[in-house]
């Protein structure tokens, strides 16, 4: 464990508490519940191009997105990094590139599960998401930078040691998914670790098999996992109140261990 960091479990707990305080400070629980129902129908189920920007059209929806999906995606990523032994150790400061970072939780969870100090680079087209990502990195005391353009970040960054793409590719069209695959494949072949996470439903991600098939089986594995989530009580209550899963999530994963 990095001697300058508190244990990951302690920092996770403090982060989730801070997330609750941040997004319930000026809103009622019932407001966030209604917003989460609307957000789930308007964004997660449709997942059309630009869906995030249009879906987050009010304080309640932004709070629901950052709080519920932030917590669930953080814990799911953390569980996968542990199970797949993707955490970084040793000397140096490996870079974790988080593409379509949203509120920053995937890259942050990976960094938190690493013994080595890391540098997270989060890229997202949403200004709201980047604002929340910067808060996430600061709250967890992680060295990090953010960029507004995924394409420009891919072009400018040197080969990162880790690449996280969590619940992101479904927001993009085929051409943009192809650009990402073409850019990161050489990195993976040179030893970068890769963690791609998407919903398991073929209806939600009909493009998955073709996209994942671009990566050689000798380097990458495709998995499906049902992850049990130890959500904080209020997040679990929010999920149940909105008719969403509170105990587990099912995902499909493309992973390369470097």
Where are these regions (language model features)?
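N-terminal auxiliary segments of SAM/dcSAM-dependent transferases
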Residues: 1-52
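Conserved Class I S-adenosyl-L-methionine-dependent methyltransferase catalytic core
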Residues: 30-88
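Conserved SAM-binding loop of SAM-dependent methyltransferases across substrates and taxa
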Residues: 103-116
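Conserved SAM/SAH-binding beta-strand->alpha-helix loop
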Residues: 126
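A short SAM/SAH-binding and catalytic strip from SAM-dependent methyltransferases
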Residues: 161-175
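A short glycine-rich, Lys/Arg-flanked "PGG" loop and its adjoining helix->strand segment in the class I
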Residues: 178-190
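Conserved beta-strand signature within the Rossmann-like core of class I S-adenosyl-L-methionine
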Residues: 190-199
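Class I S-adenosyl-L-methionine
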Residues: 217-258
């Amino acid at each position: 464990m990095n001697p300058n960091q508190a244990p990951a479990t302690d920092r996770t707990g403090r982060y989730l508490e801070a997330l609750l305080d941040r997004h319930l400070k000026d809103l009622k629980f019932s407001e966030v519940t209604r917003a989460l129902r609307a957000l789930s129908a308007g964004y997660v189920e449709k997942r059309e191009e630009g869906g995030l920007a249009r879906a987050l059209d009010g304080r309640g929806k932004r709070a629901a997105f950052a709080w519920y999906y932030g917590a669930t995606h953080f814990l799911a990523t953390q569980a996968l990094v542990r199970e797949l032994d993707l955490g970084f150790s040793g000397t140096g400061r490996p870079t974790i590139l988080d593409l379509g970072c949203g509120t920053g939780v995937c890259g942050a969870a990976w960094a938190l599960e690493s013994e080595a100090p890391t540098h997270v680079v989060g890229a997202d087209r949403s200004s709201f998401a980047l604002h929340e990502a910067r808060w996430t990195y600061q709250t967890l005391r992680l060295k990090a930078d953010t960029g507004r353009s995924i394409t420009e970040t891919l072009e400018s960054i040197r080969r990162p040691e880790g690449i996280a793409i969590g619940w992101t590719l479904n927001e993009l069209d085929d051409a943009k998914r192809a650009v990402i695959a073409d850019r990161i494949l050489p990195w993976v072949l040179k030893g970068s670790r890769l963690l791609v996470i998407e919903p398991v439903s073929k209806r939600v991600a009909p493009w998955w098999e073709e996209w994942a098939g671009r990566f050689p089986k000798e380097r990458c594995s495709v998995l499906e996992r049902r992850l049990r989530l130890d959500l904080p009580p209020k997040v679990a209550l929010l999920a149940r109140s909105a008719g969403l899963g509170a105990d587990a999530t099912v995902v499909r994963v493309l992973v390369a261990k470097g």
